[in-house]
Amino acid sequence: MEKELLLSVHDLKKSFGEREILKGISFDVRRGDVVCIIGPSGSGKSTLIRCVNYLEHPTAGTIDYRGTDVNEAFKKLTMYRTKVGMVFQSFNLFNNMTVLENCMVGQVKVLGKSKEEARTTALKYLKHVGMDTYVNAKPHQLSGGQKQRVAIARALALEPEVLLMDEPTSALDPEMVGEVLRVIRDLAKEGLTMVIVTHEMAFARDVSNRVIFIDQGVI
């Protein structure tokens, strides 16, 4: 039986001024898929994943989530982003908050959870990525690899159906890359649906069930 279709990207185009970055990209993501997007620098990989999360609004084309056009159905994109989470290359943690608070804030403000419930969920996912002993640390006290693991836990705490990752290891020192890739590998084994922009070719081959190669804005 074919797996449930979660995301469908159809003829996606994105221009910045006169420059067309994405020139008609189409692909589907089904439950349990791990799709890696690879390609040379400047090919449009990060623009594509930012469009899927609506951090950039596509110039043309559609993105359907569970058969419904995101642009039409989710007037509040915040709710869509709880279903389709995002991990950034630059972590995007709140520097004035502890590790635990970073993983709680979205649950309370967006999902309307109680602080107690949010804390329980946050601790669960921090433990999952091996960061539960750092709950009271601030981001500036962490290494790059630790920050990225916290960022992954924060995204997981919203319990998304699809997790998008934009070059999750590109801002890390080489010795930190392995610890983050290990976490992502574990998530893949557990069946989490993911779309990952990466330049780690061996990792893409190892972890994904589909690789999309983008060059000059096309697949």
Predicted regions and their residues:
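ABC family nucleotide-binding domain
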Residues: E4-L7, K13-I219
